[in-house]
Amino acid sequence: MPETLTDYVCTACGCLCDDHALTVEGRRITRVEPPCPVAAAFFLKERPAPPAAALIDGKPATLEAALARAAEILQAASAPLVFGCEQASVDAQRAAVALADRLGATIDPTDAAGRSQNHAALQTLGAVTSTLGEVAGRSDLIVYWNCDPAVTHPRHIERIARHPFTTPGDHPAARRVIVVAPNRNASTTLADEALTLRAGGDLAALAVVRAIVAAEKPADVKIDNEDQVERLTGAPLAQWAYLAQRLKLARYTAIFYAPDRSDPAGPNAIAQSITELVRDHHRHTRAVALTLGEPGNAPGAAQVLAWQTGFPSAVNFAAGFPQSLPGESTAATILERAEADAALIIAADPLDAATTSLSAAAQTHLRQIPAIVLDDHATSTAQQAAVAIFTPTFGIETTGEAFRCDNVVLPLQAAIPLRLPTTEELLHRLLALLN
């Protein structure tokens, strides 16, 4: 008999939409409403049962034997590395931090490809932010900077940018939506305006807009070479002056962007530039900046680590207390320098040749050390691991909490009954086996 679950939180993208209705038949989700291609791809995907509860050296094993072997490996290691953790609930992430603390390990939240989060701009400048609810209810101008939410976050424009105003006051007939992007994309067709940006011209364009916003009058901005502005940004100075004027005239502006982890320098620089622009903008009116967010619980991993240790990423417990050296104690750097002698990988697949972000040296070292993998299916990394233990699928079979892109915590339901121990339970059992 089909069962319908309502108000279901979807973790397929950073929006964490909490209004889905799922139709469940047995162990399969057969229908997702409201329609969303990203949610449908996540919920309706066929997920075959794992080959066994666990694998040891690629061969089926009992859960007890796998946990015992994993504990032996971690106990014998002098410099273990814990990474992944972004496809896990808050409680599982807390358990991972506790395990890293007990082991004197390094822990670094990464995405499935092994890319670490970049918090340097936040740590340097702070953040000027808000909740998505506040943006949806109060903002009269939304700028999507070099991103395509209609594809990556399909319901973002519907739920945020086109949401009716919910606060009293003399609001305009509708908020204005501007997309700044190198090419026309799915989002530009849904926006009120589309502005041109040269690929790689983010920093130059943001600097120009910031200079104009900071000036008392547009005439106060002195640009010696307007041709150079167009060459570096992909658009004439007049376009950026127009955008700056739009920002100044708005009562409440929200800028959304999507940093790319594949460029270690880019995300931090762009986040810093947008934050500086928003801070300058506050001389005129209210403005906030938010990332669109990533699938799973990436903000949760950073939040949990920060409230447990004071640092959001790349934390080392070897000294008996937490220390962080961003860029030095990231998972990718430690593996590339061959400094880890064991690895615990939680819901990540850094050895997938098609998606990995690790260098060849880092991949080689990861293959040479004993690795323990906790994941919901037999990934490339799990198949090469010393120990692989299979877990329920996060966001479908597990309950708990996850952080949305605006750092609001939302409760998770389980659409399908558990058939395996949760990641949190496995980490606690592993912790109990350590001497």
Model-derived segments and spans:
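Short, flexible loop segments at boundaries between secondary-structure elements
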Residues: 282, 286-298, 376-378
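N-terminal export/assembly segments and adjacent metallocofactor-ligating motifs
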Residues: 1-212, 259-260, 432-435
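Non-catalytic alpha/beta scaffold blocks inside enzyme catalytic domains
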Residues: 119-282, 309-435
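N-terminal, charge-rich interaction modules
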Residues: 7-19, 263, 292-310
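Short, well-ordered coil loops that connect the C-terminus of an alpha-helix to the N-terminus
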Residues: 76, 105, 283-287, 368
